[in-house]
Amino acid sequence: MEQHYHQQNQLRQLKQQQLKELLQQQSKDKEEDEQKHDDYRSPTKTTTTTATSTSAATIQSPIKSNEEDDEIDNSQHNNDTLQISEPEGESEIEEIWEHAFDPLPTSVSKNSAENVTNLGGINARVFSLSKPIYHDPNKLDLLLI
């Protein structure tokens, strides 16, 4: 009986030791992740973007009747600068922006009732119905897959 108790005690101590090591490793990993995020947030490279507008004030505010007010508002918008801090290397936003205006790839399946369109990794399926759907409170109108 004493031997069984001693084995159980050793097993319990071993589990506690493993749990402590696991918690220490998790806290260490968490600190490393936070450090990586802090490194990402720190400004290492500054990008300057200049925004210009042409006669935007007259389009945005047609109520104004005085042309001098329009010229003043327009001159204020001419040399707006925006400074963006980002880490060195190509960021995900730049990578997404490069492909923002690419045409979407489209493929049509052999079955004429189903068109599959790839929208940036999201598959949207469109089903054509031969009969209109009438509302029946006991049945679902549309089955989402």
UniProtKB/Swiss-Prot annotation:
For this UniProt record, give its keywords in alphabetical order, as a comma-separated list. Coiled coil
Q: Where is the composition biased (Low complexity)?
A: 7-26, 43-58
* Chain segments annotated as coiled-coil in the UniProt record: 1-41
Record region (Disordered): 1-91
Compositionally skewed regions (Basic and acidic residues) per UniProt: 27-42
- Name assigned to this protein: Putative uncharacterized protein DDB_G0280675
